[in-house]
């Protein structure tokens, strides 16, 4: 069976209603985890009624209650199977993140990929030796490590990251302070704006992959709606 699906229709034909009904049915009659990437803030009321967790990502870093809400793109999940390498998977994600931040049609050059991978391994080495969540690396740690590298490419990458570390778009330079283990989680990304929306969607995808990896070992499904 194909695990993917589309809900198609003309505007006003009930696509959102159909999705909400499907989510509700899955929530009530299965034990599947449900994660929603919500670009239009359509699903938060349903999620709240079902006792789920709504995470509003915005440039200000404030949730629906006005309190800070952060999701750390550097979060690393160590609960992988023996066949997976958590550090290699996280390095691959960080490469995708840097490629999105730097932009350009050609993407990252081989030397840039090597520099980023080296910096990622250096940043996570202390954490992997003592995996304390309070010491989870953040983007600022990667930025500082890149500045230590001798290659000029490292300086270029760090300069591109600066906007997201100490600049006005630094919402993702914080440790995660929201509960992500709820069975029903909705990521409201409507307020992220043009500059942050693609980055926000990539980070949500990484959080989904973390959940899928954990659930795979438990023989539990994870449904993603976006």
Predicted segment positions?
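P-loop NTPase motor domains
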Residues: 1, 44-53, 57-67, 72-224
